[in-house]
Each structure stands twice: as structure tokens, then as C-alpha cells.
Amino acid sequence: MEELLMNRFVEIFGEKGTACYFAPGRINLIGEHTDYNGGHVFPAAITLGTFGVARKRDDQKIRMFSDNFKEVGLIEFSLEDLTYSDSDDWANYPKGVLNYLIESGHNIDSGLDVLFYGTIPNGAGLSSSASIELLMGTICNDLYALHCPMLELVQIGKKVENEFIGVNSGIMDQFAVGMGEKDQAILLDTNNMHYEMVPAKLGEYTIVIMNTNKRRELADSKYNERRAECEEAVRLLQKELSIEFLGELDSETFEQYQALIGDPALIKRARHAVTENERTLLAKQALTEGDLEEFGLLLNASHRSLKEDYEVTGIELDTLVACAQEQPGVLGARMTGAGFGGCSIALVPKQNIDAFIEAVGQSYQDKIGYAADFYPASIDDGARKLF
């Protein structure tokens, strides 16, 4: 792959690239819709991601090309004008990184040429945008010798998303992409950014990512709706409880005080936030102890809660997950990401992968009318220079 990209770089830019880089995508193992509820998330970097080949220029020109968006063509802009532009399309993500690195006082004194190529399916909810942001940060850090800590690049990536692009997302995606380690999941407390690396040794099992191939049109509007519902539940609970987030409660306390919320729909939303946070902490314990069966059961329980209490799944995700859970040897499956399309994950015996993909794929095609895509993935290192 790297050699192909080095040759492709010469085709596009006419000269050899000086180095090759990679930034992964991410999955969230468990802890869904907990980040804005003051809970824990449990992401991991994966083997799918974005490759980049780059070289510095001796002028102020930035030139970017993505083999995933060939139709957009070569995108050019100047270091002296790093404002958002619709015509720059996907390149606004790396452009934003350049903008905030310079704004933070880092010395980027000349332009560069960059070729991007991603193996993350677009729109699948596996953080292709965070992957591009951290890839660009890693390229700049290396080529301009910025000595910028990864955590700062993570925060710049989030700033690009929130302020440059205008998407109201948390820090989990960039954190996982930047800080990921091979065979380690990251338990992140979204309240205070405390994190710990947890061994995720899956032994004879592998994670299969299942893409519904359903466009996530509803995700943004429903995401904002759920967020508002949780905030309202907190406001009602605050009549008797001094809490700021649902993630501060355990199930027992929640059950004791849920009558304060009144509205049955709001109770369900809040119950998911509370129980999912508990499941995430139990999942950490299960992985630490090497108890993959328990970990799988927690994945199943998470999906059930997202389906019944949080109501963010939909027929496509439910079909994939239900069928996956029925396959021989599968320990667990759940949707991952915002929901309403996107992806789910399953913990599948390595020896059964082909049979699993065939059976679940056929069942999905029969019921939904179009194909799902399947990607076996391992937990891998974060953004890095390859050579």
C-alpha cells in the first residue's frame, strides 16, 4: 500500500514524497451516547484509517489530493488564506488543522503537497474526519519539527470539528485516533479527560464491523433531540439531587428518583445514560479479567438499551445485530456510533469470519433489500509516521 501511494504521489505532484503517515479510524466498544451525559466511553483505534504521503514546498502554496474524492480534483490554497471554503470540500478538515496550529503559535513557514487515501467507508460513523485531522497534525508535527504533544493535536482536531467545520461533537473520536495503542482500548471519563489504557486481548476472536450502508440522515436531528431530552431529565432530577449529569448516578439511585422525571419517554432516555455508563465500567472490568463472554453479554445489553430505551437504532441496525447475535460462537454485537444507520460491531471467532459474513450478509440483503458491508478489524496504534 505504502509503495503504491509513493508512486501515486509522483503521478499527481510530479516529485517524490518524503514520508508516509497513517491515522486510524475508531470504534467505540461500548459507552454510546454517554459522552454528553458526563459518562465514560470506551473507544479503540482500528486498522482501517487514512494514509498520507507528503513533502514540503519552498513557497506558500498548499496542494492536496484525495484518491477517495478524485472527482473533486487537486485542491490548492495558500498558507496566507486558511479560511473555510465550500469549494475546498473535504480539504477543509486538514486546512483547519493548519489554521489552528499556526494560531497556537507553531511555526509553519512553507507550503506542502499531501496525498490522502482512506480505507474507512465514508459516512459509516468510524471517524474518517478525525482520522484526516490527526493525520494532518502528525504530518505537520514531523515535517515542520513542531514538537507538539499528541494531546494538543487531539484538541486541535476537536476545535476543527467544532469551530472550523461547525459540528457539535465531543473529543472521543480525536482522542481514540491520536492516543490509540495496539490491543488496548481507552476508558475515557468525559467529565475530566482522565483516561486509562485497558488491555483488549481478544484471543481467538476478532471484531467485525458491519456497515448498514444506510445514509444517516436522521442522526443529527435525533442526536440533538436526545441530548435535549437528557438535559431536561437532569433539570427535573435536580429538584432533589445535586447532579450536573446523568453519568453521576447509579441505577439504584436513578430508580429511587425517576418519578421526578414523570414523562415515560424521558425516563427511558435517562435510564439508558445511567445504565450504559455502568455497563462501560463493567466492560473495562471484564476485559481486564479476560472475561470475553461477560464482555459480549454487555455488548448485547448495550444494544438492547439503545434500541428500547434510547430508540436510536432502526430496522437496519437491529437486523444486522439480531442476526449477528444468532451466529455460532458470536459472543455479542451492538450498534456503534450515533445510530440511525452507520455501523454495528460483533465479536466473532476468527475461524468463523467467512461463514459469519455470508450468513449475516444474506439475511440482511433478504430483509432490507440491499447489501451490508463487512470489515474484520483489529485494535491498532494511533496516528503515526510509517517511514
UniProtKB/Swiss-Prot annotation:
Positions contributing to Mg(2+) binding: 129, 161
UniProt pathway: Carbohydrate metabolism; galactose metabolism
Keywords noted in UniProt: ATP-binding, Carbohydrate metabolism, Cytoplasm, Galactose metabolism, Kinase, Magnesium, Metal-binding, Nucleotide-binding, Transferase
Active-site residue list: 173
Pfam families (alphabetical): GalKase_gal_bdg, GHMP_kinases_C, GHMP_kinases_N
Site annotation Transition state stabilizer: residues: 26
EC number per UniProt: 2.7.1.6
Transmembrane helix listed as a keyword: no
One GO term describing the cellular component: cytosol
Binding, substrate: 32-35, 223
Gene3D superfamilies attached to this UniProt entry: 3.30.230.10, GHMP kinase, C-terminal domain
GO molecular function annotation: ATP binding; galactokinase activity; magnesium ion binding
Domain of life from the UniProt record: Bacteria
GO BP field: galactose metabolic process
Main location per the UniProt record: cytoplasm
Residues the entry annotates as binding ATP: 66, 123-129
Compartments reported by the entry: Cytoplasm
Catalytic reaction equation(s): alpha-D-galactose + ATP = alpha-D-galactose 1-phosphate + ADP + H(+)
Family statement drawn from the similarity comment of this UniProt entry: Belongs to the GHMP kinase family. GalK subfamily.
Free-text function comment from the UniProt entry: Catalyzes the transfer of the gamma-phosphate of ATP to D-galactose to form alpha-D-galactose-1-phosphate (Gal-1-P).
Classification via HAMAP family: Galactokinase
Protein name as annotated: Galactokinase
